[in-house]
């Protein structure tokens, strides 16, 4: 009995601790916004790459979430598919900017990152 109780406690603590590791949608959006500002103000490729890498991770994590406006919708609904597609676009744009940053092209990476704002604004209009 004691061993099974300990096992249950161990499993439940793992479940709750893993849930706390995953950032919620709002946290991911904040990470994207904060790091976009870093990209805009950066003066070297290392800063740009670091910020874009954080943005990419946040976008991929946010893609798994459901925005409040779509709560109750099926994961296969057209709206949810479009929401996730927006993150596919965003990740592609981040990858394009990251490629430029990896080549040391800071100004070009910053210019490419400007597209992120257009995507953000379009999808915020739909789902925020």
Curated annotation (Swiss-Prot):
Residues 1-22 form the signal peptide. GO terms for biological process: electron transport chain. It is found in: Periplasm. It comes from the Bacteria. Binds 1 heme b (iron(II)-protoporphyrin IX) group per molecule. Keywords: Electron transport, Heme, Iron, Metal-binding, Periplasm, Signal, Transport. GO terms for cellular component: periplasmic space. One of its GO terms (molecular function) is heme binding. Belongs to the cytochrome b562 family. Electron-transport protein of unknown function. Monomer. This is Soluble cytochrome b562. It comes from Escherichia coli O6:H1 (strain CFT073 / ATCC 700928 / UPEC). The lineage of its organism: Bacteria, Pseudomonadati, Pseudomonadota, Gammaproteobacteria, Enterobacterales.
């Amino acid at each position: 009995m004691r061993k099974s109780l300990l096992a249950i406690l161990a499993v439940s603590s793992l479940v709750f601790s893993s849930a706390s590791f995953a950032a919620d949608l709002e946290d991911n959006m904040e990470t994207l916004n904060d790091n976009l500002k870093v990209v805009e103000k950066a003066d070297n490729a290392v800063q740009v790459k670091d910020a874009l890498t954080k943005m990419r991770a946040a976008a991929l994590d946010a893609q798994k979430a459901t925005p409040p406006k779509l709560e109750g919708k099926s994961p296969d609904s057209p709206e949810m598919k479009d929401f996730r597609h927006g993150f596919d676009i965003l990740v592609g744009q981040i990858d394009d900017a990251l490629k430029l940053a990896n080549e040391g092209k800071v100004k070009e990476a910053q210019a490419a990152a400007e597209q992120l704002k257009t995507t953000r604004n379009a999808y915020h209009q739909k789902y925020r």
